Amino acid sequence: MSIRVIYPGTFDPITNGHLDLLSRACALFDHVILAIAESPNKKTLFSLNERVDLAKGATAHLNNIEVTSFHGLLIHFAQQKNIPILLRGIRSLSDFEQEWQLCHMNHRIMPELETLFLMPSEKWAFISSSLVKEIAQYRGDVSAFVPDCVKEALLR
């Protein structure tokens, strides 16, 4: 039996923390879908297509990953893909509180949906896309936090 999971998020932009979680997920599961949310209620730096392209570039070294985008509710995307497992990363207690609510709301709507949580490696536990964007906005060096393709995009 092939175990497939969806790792959803905005990924604006994808960071080394995301890549750490993805590489570990690829070792645990047969197929990982990196599902990039349109997120119309969020003000994103990169367009949906740019975020997909950056994620594809950053994950090219991973064999069992598929990068795609989705619109609307994540549970509808999971149903469409026939994948009942979500993978989420938790860096902090505040992440846990938000993920706990989402997990239970999703489960209430789609009872067969399970959410698995992975803690980041200690090296990447403090990184967030928001912090990376703020550092880049003031022309700080983000090379330790993002893959090269993202660094180049942030410098444009």
From Swiss-Prot:
CDD domains from the UniProt entry: PPAT
Pathway listed: Cofactor biosynthesis; coenzyme A biosynthesis; CoA from (R)-pantothenate: step 4/5
Transmembrane segments: none
Keyword Transcription regulation: no
GO CC annotation terms, alphabetical: cytoplasm
Biological process (GO), any one: coenzyme A biosynthetic process
Binding site for substrate: T10, K42, L74, R88
GO molecular function, one term: pantetheine-phosphate adenylyltransferase activity
Location in or out of the cell: Cytoplasm
Subunit structure, as described in the record: Homohexamer.
Family matches, as PANTHER family: PHOSPHOPANTETHEINE ADENYLYLTRANSFERASE (PTHR21342:SF1)
Biological role: Reversibly transfers an adenylyl group from ATP to 4'-phosphopantetheine, yielding dephospho-CoA (dPCoA) and pyrophosphate.
Protein name: Phosphopantetheine adenylyltransferase
Organism the protein comes from: Hamiltonella defensa subsp. Acyrthosiphon pisum (strain 5AT)
